[in-house]
Amino acid sequence: FELNATEVSAVYAVQQLKDRLKNPSSLKLLSVAISKPYENTSVPIKIDYTAENNIGGTVEDTYYCVVSLATYDKDNDTWSCGLESLFQSRYRLELVNSLLGSKSSIEGSQEYAKKEYNRGKPANLDAEKIISNQALTIKEVEN
């Protein structure tokens, strides 16, 4: 499959989701959508999926994130992408608060990403094309 920058951004988002799952190999995508219009630098993404939980049951859920629009380096034949900085900082704060057992009054990463996604018009991507390209190497960049 030939991928465009938006699709590579979605592949990266699915890779990030897999990193958060207890059983990443159980991930099944139900749908993948981006929100248009998005800024040239950020892509809000919504992923509906199922995965196995730690007791063997299947959970259906939605994951929202905001990633940078992937860029392609022709000289090195590599794609680059990363989590959008506001999304990433909110996610890190959630992790720290979780470790400390405290709550934050700041809007969480999922709420932030869902709000960004809902600001635009959803456009579905081919979920099969996204999941079949999970082996794609994407250089992670800080935004």
Show where each model-derived region lies.
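Cystatin/cathelin-like cysteine-protease inhibitor module
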Residues: 1-143
